[in-house]
Amino acid sequence: MPDAWDKFGKTVEVSGEGMVLTKTSGGNYSRHAAAKELLSSGVHSWEVELTSGATQNNNRDMFIGVAAPGCDVEKGDHHDKGKAWYLRTHDGNVYGGDIDCEDAAKKGKFFLVGDRVGLRLDCNDGSLRFYKNGEPFGEQFPPGTISMPVVRAVELKCNGQSVTLFPEVQLA
């Protein structure tokens, strides 16, 4: 069976045979969720589709990437603690690994409902590349940035936000 969302807190629900993750309650605070498969060697590619924005205002501000196993699912911002490496859909920047990107213009316009964030993790060199709808996108985490092992991870912020995991996708 392919990987699925496995670790999540009380404000999040999983459906669709473990592939759909939705923040259903709580305030507008990031909450971590992770998939089950431990990624420690080889090259892995997958996509996360933005299934829905926030119920109140369609906000799609979320983090998508990888994290060290065991991060607290009732908290967020694990990239600030050196435990996660994410693309933030709100500004298109990467967060984690001491990478400091310039503040982006047009916040909130980078990813819309239905868009897919592709990820290609090379565990052998510790790099992570991002894609938008199958095309290379934005900054990357260069070789040596990411410490293995990791798990697929997201942080959802607002009630109603939902993502769908597609764990086996080919990305160049």
Residue ranges and their predicted role:
Residues 1-172:
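PRY/SPRY (B30.2) beta-sandwich protein-interaction domains
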